[in-house]
């Protein structure tokens, strides 16, 4: 873990970005490779999906949609205990996200002028669920339940197949609990292309959400405009603000819970107490050796772990706001008092019993969060990502007559005479 002492004047945003090195590096070579995959699927459809799945996943698929038989086979492999946990998690996620639902509205703003907004679910969305180092049934729930709460009538999910040509049973069990019925065994950039462009057997979607590897991130970036996307997700990150009142064993465990995701996952400890920070560092080294994903955690901690030694709480949260972390834990006495100091964080966990994994699985708020500093301008996935709104405007004759001349003056000032003409012809009524 690299130690950084924050000077009295603090660091600038540019300095913090340099120190933390959280840029999502999507190279030109990667762009070329992904562009070729997208073009192949767009032009080749189902045949291209089969060819690319064989090439990248080593699996030959005649039909890449999950069948009811495969779903039932998967459910038979899942323990009843895990199925109940999935159901409880789904209920918590659903309850939380129902609070985000917006209702359409109209209001009489002036005599004869009715204005409003109409909120409508996106009619068809695609959800990408990653495979790779681990299977994430939690991501299935987090990314599909808000879409269903929003009222999206069509949700298509895709995820990479295993070497046996099947989807991980836990992934399918989560989809079953969520209520998703359209599931495909297609991963990587080709999965994104399938959702964006459609094939002979797959209807295209209007928006794609969900995290993935660099190929998936690049594919989402390149199809944006053809479809909407939620975000470009980078490696996971956690930031913990803590002092000597916290337990270094607990803090170390929380930091490692994110380090195990990816060799490029970042962990940040921000503290005014150097002795406490050193205890956390020692604990991280000890605990890593006892956990199964040691090599991944070791790479993350060696390359992307930073400890910022600050002068006081105000300086701690100044650094937090410049990092704009995906996950932020605050383990200081009376942690709620610091909320007004926090501007930039994807998810905020207050107090020593609010360990970050609660948010990953069971609490209810979404765990698909902005990474790489993007929490400074973006938000967690939610119902609002699956809804669009249209403005609604209605004038009666009297209201039109009051405003018509002013619109004509405005239009002519911009040189748009046809706009003015559209008003003039109604003046004669």
For the regions a language model picked out, list residue spans one by one.
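Alpha-helix C-terminal capping segments
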Residues: 142-153, 176-178, 196-202, 220-222, ...
């Amino acid at each position: 873990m690299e130690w950084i002492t924050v000077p009295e004047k603090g660091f600038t945003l540019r300095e913090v970005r340099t120190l933390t090195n959280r840029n999502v590096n999507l190279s030109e070579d990667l762009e070329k490779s992904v562009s070729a995959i997208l073009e192949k699927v767009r032009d080749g459809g189902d045949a291209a999906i089969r060819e690319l799945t064989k090439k990248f996943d080593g699996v030959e698929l005649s039909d890449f949609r999950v069948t009811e038989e495969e779903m039932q086979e998967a459910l038979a492999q899942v323990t009843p205990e895990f199925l109940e946990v999935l159901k409880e998690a789904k209920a918590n996620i659903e309850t939380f996200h129902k609070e985000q639902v917006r209702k359409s509205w109209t209001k009489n703003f002036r005599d004869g002028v009715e204005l409003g907004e109409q909120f409508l679910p996106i009619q068809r969305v695609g959800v990408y669920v990653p495979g790779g180092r681990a299977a994430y049934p939690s991501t299935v729930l987090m990314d599909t339940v808000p879409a269903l709460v929003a009222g999206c009538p069509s949700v298509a999910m895709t995820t990479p197949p295993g070497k046996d040509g099947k989807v991980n049973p836990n992934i399918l069990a989560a989809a079953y609990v969520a209520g998703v019925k359209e599931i495909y065994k297609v991963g990587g950039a080709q999965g994104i292309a399938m959702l964006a462009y459609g094939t002979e057997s797959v209807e295209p979607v209007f928006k794609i959400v969900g995290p993935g590897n660099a190929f998936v991130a690049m594919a989402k970036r390149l199809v944006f405009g053809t479809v909407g996307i939620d975000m470009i997700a980078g490696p996971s990150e956690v930031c913990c603000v803590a002092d000597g009142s916290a337990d270094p064993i607990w803090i170390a465990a929380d930091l490692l819970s994110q380090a195990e995701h990816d060799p490029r996952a970042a962990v940040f400890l921000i503290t005014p107490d150097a002795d406490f920070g050193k205890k956390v560092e020692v604990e991280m080294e000890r605990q890593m050796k006892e956990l199964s994903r040691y090599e991944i955690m070791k790479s993350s901690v060696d390359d992307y772990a930073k400890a910022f030694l600050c002068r006081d709480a105000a300086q701690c949260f100044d650094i937090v706001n410049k990092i704009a972390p995906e996950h932020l834990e605050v383990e200081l006495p009376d942690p709620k008092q610091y909320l007004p100091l926090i501007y930039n964080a994807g998810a905020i966990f207050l107090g020593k019993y609010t360990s970050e994994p609660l948010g990953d699985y069971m609490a209810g708020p979404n765990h698909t969060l902005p990474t790489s500093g993007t929490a400074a301008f973006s938000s967690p996935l939610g119902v609002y990502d699956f809804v669009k709104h249209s403005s609604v405007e209605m004038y009666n004759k009297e209201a039109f007559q009051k405003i018509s001349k002013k619109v004509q003056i405005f239009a002519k000032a911009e040189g748009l005479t046809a706009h003015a003409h559209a008003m003039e012809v109604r003046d004669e009524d």
